[in-house]
Amino acid sequence: MRNLTYWVKVPFINNYLLKILKYNREKIHNLFLKNTIYNDNCSLIDIGTTVDTNNSHNIILQKTQKNKNISCLSNQDIDSLKKKFPHIKDFYIGDGKKTDFDDNTYDIVYSSATLEHVGSFQNQINFINECTRISKYQIFITTPNRSCFIDFHTKLPFLHWLPKKIHRKILKLIGYKFYCLEENLNLLDKKSLIKIMKILNITNFKILEHKFLIFKSNLIIIIDKKIN
């Protein structure tokens, strides 16, 4: 199984950028704690767990080590994480758009920086729908904001504001053959997330716009099933 990486390394400043990423994600984790019912007794599944062991990734696993009811689902082989995160109850390999879990299996379904990597807009709809189906209470999903001036995957500014077909053609021309494929990168803006909510007939949700410095770098969608 081929493990994927969605982070373009930048010479000389890569470690600095990873520190910024970690800081940003820890701020988002604070929003998670503030806006959900999470406690150390909740059952939670992280969908889209990465095999990358750098501390800027898998923040949710780092911050929940007192909880013995945490599971992970990834399309990559994440067995290597068992040693680093011994508190994790279950590691699953599968497709977040279509899982084998029963309805309402987990108190909270969590997914960080995965939605933009599941492919087409229809795939993104299916992904959110599946997260909602297997959650009993809440869904917490983060994704980079296409409206931000820079794409943090490629580290290129403004280019992703072009129509997506043109954006992908340019990425291919300048050597970003991985990111030029919709199946690997399909950024969303707030309007797109609202459209997905309407398609899925989800009414009890809120979208937070997380800022890095003065820029709205990340979108966070929180769905509360107790009222839907």
Positions of PLM-derived features:
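Short glycine/proline- and acidic residue-enriched helix-loop micro-motifs
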Residues: 14-15, 173-183
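Conserved class I S-adenosyl-L-methionine
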Residues: 139-168
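Core SAM-dependent methyltransferase catalytic element
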Residues: 205-228
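Short alpha-helix
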Residues: 181-201
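Short amphipathic alpha-helical segments and helix-helix/interface helices
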Residues: 29, 33, 57-62, 128-129, ...
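Conserved SAM-binding loop
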Residues: 42-148, 223-226
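Soluble or luminal CAZymes and related metallo-dependent hydrolases
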Residues: 20-28, 53, 123, 185-192
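Class I SAM-dependent methyltransferase Rossmann-like catalytic core
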Residues: 1-37
